[in-house]
Amino acid sequence: MTVRPQFGVGRVTRFYVPMLLQAFSQSLTYPLVAGIVTHGVYGVHELTAFAQGQMIMFMIGAFGGGLMMTGMVFATDRAGYLNFRKLNALMMAALLAAQCLPALPPFNTWVFEGGFSLSPDLAQIARETLLWGTVMNGSFFLRNVPLVVLFNNLQSGKANVATCVRIVLTVASAALFPRLGWTGAGPGLFALTLGCVVELAITWFYARPYTRELLAQPGAADADNAVSTQFRFTLPLSFGGLLLMMSPIIIAAFVSRTPQAADMLAIHYVT
């Protein structure tokens, strides 16, 4: 583990700004793909369907929203890191399985045609977006482990590089795909997923030396860093994010029953 330097406002600010970009990047990249999706067969209505699948994906992913903070608290030695990695894998498997469930019959009909009042064609787009979005959501979960290692070693700048690459790739895809005729929900999801996978690979690359150093440390698991302890710590941290992600879904359910609902839902997603 890197020896922590003396505390100072300037040093804290330099550590914080890259972390701020991590959160800001999500708000920036998702609207960028709107230009890809809206040039699909169903136009702006395709973005509406795409958005419903994405919103459910984000809500399910919010159950793991506290994992990052959990890792920064517990994954500071070998045993804590190994147990955090196990917890992250278990929660990823459970939540990705939960993400697939609403995309499978008969639940997909209940959710997208019943809950969001989408036509069968648009409901199919939303279903496929949710189902194939497991790759994107999975990359976010896998990124937790190396990202925690970088943050715990005060290397938020290196994490920032990976995030900047994701943003650049998404911007490039948003500009290039429509010119090549690659439009619609599928290419839009691919543009988002590509950036996430590349970001994951870069983050793992930067974290490798720090991970080797961490695994070389002695230490045994105990009740203070057990998987169950870390899980109980994660749940309250995730709860606030879950409530935030439920809000747009509840709003979308109301909007879907208004005149010109498809147009309004597309705007709701972008904003």
Located regions from the model:
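Short alpha-helical transmembrane segments in multi-pass integral membrane proteins
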Residues: 1-20, 72-136, 176-235
